[in-house]
A protein has these predicted regions:
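Short solvent-exposed beta->alpha transition segments
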Residues: 37-67
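Short beta-strand segments enriched in hydrophobic/aromatic residues
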Residues: 34, 89-93, 108, 124
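Short, low-complexity N-terminal intrinsically disordered segments enriched in polar/charged residues
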Residues: 1-24
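Short, surface-exposed coil-to-beta transition loops
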Residues: 86, 101-107
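Low-complexity, intrinsically disordered terminal/linker segments enriched in charged
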Residues: 119-135
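Short, solvent-exposed coil/turn segments at beta-strand boundaries
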Residues: 82, 110-117
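Surface-exposed, charged secondary-structure patches
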Residues: 57-98
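Short, well-ordered alpha-helical segments enriched in acidic and aromatic residues
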Residues: 24-37, 41
Length: 135
């Protein structure tokens, strides 16, 4: 499979807008980029948009200053018509309970069909995140 990759297109911008909305606890504001039946794979869990919106928003109850840094985004346009936007990032936040700052690396992709995101994959090691929430 081959194709081409770009970093300054509408789909890469949509990924960045989604991640900014997450950081601002406003994922609902970008719902229009997703298909009605979008499925999110968060590590090994499959979720709907509404479940992701609720779950990601709940993280703001435990952490302040949620940020993405070291972000790298690009969209792959494959010759077979598939389109994926890839996003590598460093997630950081400060625990509201312990005031500890935690940092973790993550990777996400959007799969596009008809200019809508139909599938999302997001992978990260949740160990430190879960430990801070349990404190």
């Amino acid at each position: 499979m081959s194709g081409y990759m770009v970093g300054n297109d509408d789909k890469s911008d949509a990924m960045l807008n989604f991640t900014k909305a997450y950081q601002n606890n406003d994922i609902g504001s970008v719902k229009s980029i997703f298909s009605e039946n979008v499925i999110f794979h968060i590590n090994d869990t499959d979720l709907t948009f509404d479940e992701v919106n609720e779950g990601f928003s709940a993280g703001h109850n435990f952490f302040d200053n949620i940020k993405h840094s070291d972000a790298d985004v690009s969209t792959m346009y494959y010759n077979d018509g598939q389109i994926f936007t890839n996003y590598w990032y460093t997630w950081s936040a400060v625990s509201k309970k312990t005031n500890n700052k935690i940092t973790l690396k993550g990777y996400c992709w959007f799969k596009w069909e008809n200019d809508k995101v139909v599938e999302v994959y997001n992978a990260f090691d949740p160990t430190a995140y879960i430990a801070e929430m349990a404190n």
